[in-house]
Amino acid sequence: MSVKILSVAKQLPKHTRETKDIIPFVKLWMQGQETRFQRKVLKLFEGAGVDRRYSIMDAEEVFLNSSFEDKNNIYVREVTTLAEQSLKKSLEKASLQPTDIDYIITVSCTGIMIPSVDAYLINSLQMRQDIVRLPVTEMGCAAGVSGIIYAKNFLQANPNKRAAVIAVESPTATFQLEDFSMVNIVSAAIFGDGA
Protein backbone atom coordinates (compact mmCIF):
# COMPACT_ATOMS: atom_id res chain seq x y z
CA MET A 1 0.00 0.00 0.00
CA SER A 2 1.35 3.41 -0.89
CA VAL A 3 1.42 6.24 1.61
CA LYS A 4 1.46 9.92 0.70
CA ILE A 5 1.86 13.25 2.44
CA LEU A 6 -1.32 15.30 2.00
CA SER A 7 -0.07 18.64 3.33
CA VAL A 8 2.76 20.42 5.07
CA ALA A 9 2.55 23.58 7.17
CA LYS A 10 4.88 25.60 9.34
CA GLN A 11 4.43 28.00 12.21
CA LEU A 12 7.11 30.43 13.29
CA PRO A 13 7.15 32.17 16.66
CA LYS A 14 6.38 35.87 16.96
CA HIS A 15 9.85 36.99 18.07
CA THR A 16 12.21 37.57 15.17
CA ARG A 17 15.37 39.54 14.53
CA GLU A 18 17.96 39.77 11.81
CA THR A 19 21.33 38.26 12.68
CA LYS A 20 22.95 41.72 12.62
CA ASP A 21 20.60 42.69 15.47
CA ILE A 22 21.63 39.62 17.51
CA ILE A 23 25.38 40.30 17.25
CA PRO A 24 25.39 42.92 20.07
CA PHE A 25 23.87 40.29 22.39
CA VAL A 26 26.52 37.77 21.33
CA LYS A 27 29.27 40.35 22.01
CA LEU A 28 27.88 40.96 25.51
CA TRP A 29 27.67 37.21 26.11
CA MET A 30 31.29 36.74 25.01
CA GLN A 31 32.69 39.45 27.31
CA GLY A 32 35.45 38.03 29.46
CA GLN A 33 36.33 35.32 26.94
CA GLU A 34 39.65 35.25 25.10
CA THR A 35 39.72 37.80 22.24
CA ARG A 36 40.59 35.20 19.60
CA PHE A 37 37.69 33.01 20.79
CA GLN A 38 35.30 36.00 20.66
CA ARG A 39 36.30 36.72 17.04
CA LYS A 40 35.80 33.05 16.14
CA VAL A 41 32.30 33.01 17.67
CA LEU A 42 31.26 36.26 15.98
CA LYS A 43 32.54 34.96 12.64
CA LEU A 44 30.49 31.79 13.18
CA PHE A 45 27.29 33.76 13.82
CA GLU A 46 27.90 36.15 10.93
CA GLY A 47 28.84 33.38 8.49
CA ALA A 48 26.16 30.85 9.46
CA GLY A 49 23.96 31.79 6.51
CA VAL A 50 21.04 32.62 8.81
CA ASP A 51 19.68 36.07 7.93
CA ARG A 52 16.65 36.06 10.24
CA ARG A 53 16.23 34.26 13.54
CA TYR A 54 12.94 33.17 15.08
CA SER A 55 12.48 32.54 18.77
CA ILE A 56 9.77 31.74 21.31
CA MET A 57 11.23 34.50 23.48
CA ASP A 58 12.71 37.93 22.86
CA ALA A 59 16.51 38.18 22.55
CA GLU A 60 16.70 39.91 25.93
CA GLU A 61 15.08 36.85 27.53
CA VAL A 62 17.32 34.41 25.64
CA PHE A 63 20.46 36.11 26.93
CA LEU A 64 19.09 36.56 30.46
CA ASN A 65 20.73 34.44 33.13
CA SER A 66 17.59 32.48 33.98
CA SER A 67 17.28 28.90 35.13
CA PHE A 68 16.64 25.97 32.82
CA GLU A 69 13.32 25.51 34.62
CA ASP A 70 12.24 29.08 33.81
CA LYS A 71 13.15 28.69 30.14
CA ASN A 72 11.52 25.26 29.99
CA ASN A 73 8.27 26.74 31.33
CA ILE A 74 8.32 29.17 28.39
CA TYR A 75 9.08 26.21 26.10
CA VAL A 76 6.03 24.26 27.34
CA ARG A 77 3.71 27.21 26.82
CA GLU A 78 5.03 28.33 23.45
CA VAL A 79 5.73 25.05 21.64
CA THR A 80 2.24 23.83 22.43
CA THR A 81 0.86 26.91 20.67
CA LEU A 82 3.26 26.54 17.71
CA ALA A 83 2.44 22.85 17.31
CA GLU A 84 -1.30 23.50 17.49
CA GLN A 85 -1.18 26.31 14.92
CA SER A 86 0.98 24.25 12.57
CA LEU A 87 -1.28 21.20 12.82
CA LYS A 88 -4.43 23.28 12.29
CA LYS A 89 -2.93 24.83 9.13
CA SER A 90 -1.92 21.44 7.77
CA LEU A 91 -5.32 19.89 8.48
CA GLU A 92 -7.07 22.81 6.80
CA LYS A 93 -4.87 22.46 3.69
CA ALA A 94 -5.80 18.76 3.52
CA SER A 95 -9.51 19.48 4.20
CA LEU A 96 -9.37 17.33 7.34
CA GLN A 97 -10.70 17.76 10.87
CA PRO A 98 -8.69 16.96 14.01
CA THR A 99 -11.03 14.00 14.60
CA ASP A 100 -9.96 12.50 11.25
CA ILE A 101 -6.49 11.71 12.62
CA ASP A 102 -5.84 8.16 13.87
CA TYR A 103 -2.16 8.49 14.80
CA ILE A 104 -0.31 11.53 16.12
CA ILE A 105 3.48 11.73 16.26
CA THR A 106 5.16 14.70 17.89
CA VAL A 107 8.86 15.33 17.55
CA SER A 108 11.01 17.54 19.79
CA CYS A 109 14.37 17.35 21.49
CA THR A 110 14.73 20.86 22.89
CA GLY A 111 12.58 20.85 26.00
CA ILE A 112 11.01 18.60 28.58
CA MET A 113 7.25 18.06 28.75
CA ILE A 114 5.30 15.46 30.68
CA PRO A 115 2.86 14.72 29.23
CA SER A 116 4.35 15.44 25.82
CA VAL A 117 2.95 18.00 23.39
CA ASP A 118 0.74 15.42 21.64
CA ALA A 119 -1.41 15.05 24.78
CA TYR A 120 -1.96 18.81 24.87
CA LEU A 121 -2.90 18.80 21.17
CA ILE A 122 -5.39 15.97 21.64
CA ASN A 123 -7.16 18.00 24.33
CA SER A 124 -6.95 21.47 22.78
CA LEU A 125 -8.08 20.30 19.32
CA GLN A 126 -10.65 17.85 20.76
CA MET A 127 -9.14 14.92 18.90
CA ARG A 128 -10.50 11.42 19.39
CA GLN A 129 -9.62 9.75 22.68
CA ASP A 130 -8.68 6.50 20.90
CA ILE A 131 -5.96 8.21 18.84
CA VAL A 132 -2.59 6.43 18.87
CA ARG A 133 0.17 8.67 20.28
CA LEU A 134 3.91 8.57 19.75
CA PRO A 135 6.15 11.27 21.21
CA VAL A 136 9.61 11.15 19.59
CA THR A 137 12.21 12.86 21.77
CA GLU A 138 15.96 13.21 22.16
CA MET A 139 16.77 12.08 18.60
CA GLY A 140 18.22 15.37 17.38
CA CYS A 141 18.22 16.29 13.71
CA ALA A 142 17.09 12.84 12.56
CA ALA A 143 13.89 12.93 14.61
CA GLY A 144 11.69 14.58 11.98
CA VAL A 145 12.59 11.97 9.39
CA SER A 146 12.13 9.24 12.00
CA GLY A 147 8.65 10.59 12.75
CA ILE A 148 7.75 10.38 9.06
CA ILE A 149 9.08 6.80 8.88
CA TYR A 150 7.04 5.83 11.97
CA ALA A 151 3.93 7.32 10.33
CA LYS A 152 4.60 5.46 7.06
CA ASN A 153 5.03 2.16 8.89
CA PHE A 154 1.83 2.70 10.89
CA LEU A 155 -0.16 3.61 7.78
CA GLN A 156 1.12 0.66 5.78
CA ALA A 157 0.11 -1.67 8.61
CA ASN A 158 -3.26 0.08 9.08
CA PRO A 159 -4.85 0.85 5.69
CA ASN A 160 -7.33 3.73 5.45
CA LYS A 161 -5.95 5.45 8.55
CA ARG A 162 -4.48 8.96 8.80
CA ALA A 163 -1.43 10.19 10.68
CA ALA A 164 -0.11 13.61 11.63
CA VAL A 165 3.57 14.30 12.30
CA ILE A 166 4.36 17.53 14.13
CA ALA A 167 7.99 18.54 14.64
CA VAL A 168 8.48 21.47 16.98
CA GLU A 169 11.79 22.75 18.28
CA SER A 170 13.03 25.63 20.40
CA PRO A 171 16.80 25.62 20.85
CA THR A 172 16.56 29.08 22.42
CA ALA A 173 14.84 27.39 25.38
CA THR A 174 17.90 25.21 25.96
CA PHE A 175 20.52 27.91 25.36
CA GLN A 176 22.83 28.00 28.38
CA LEU A 177 24.46 31.37 29.10
CA GLU A 178 27.31 29.83 31.13
CA ASP A 179 28.16 27.25 28.47
CA PHE A 180 30.88 28.37 26.05
CA SER A 181 31.26 24.96 24.42
CA MET A 182 31.20 24.77 20.63
CA VAL A 183 28.07 22.58 20.83
CA ASN A 184 26.14 25.37 22.57
CA ILE A 185 27.63 28.08 20.34
CA VAL A 186 26.98 26.27 17.05
CA SER A 187 23.44 25.43 18.17
CA ALA A 188 22.80 29.11 18.96
CA ALA A 189 24.35 30.19 15.65
CA ILE A 190 22.49 27.90 13.25
CA PHE A 191 19.23 26.69 14.79
CA GLY A 192 15.96 28.55 15.29
CA ASP A 193 12.55 27.93 16.81
CA GLY A 194 9.42 26.81 15.02
CA ALA A 195 7.04 24.01 14.07
Residue ranges with predicted function:
Residues D102-S108:
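Short glycine-rich or small-residue beta-strand-to-loop segments that form or flank ligand, phosphate
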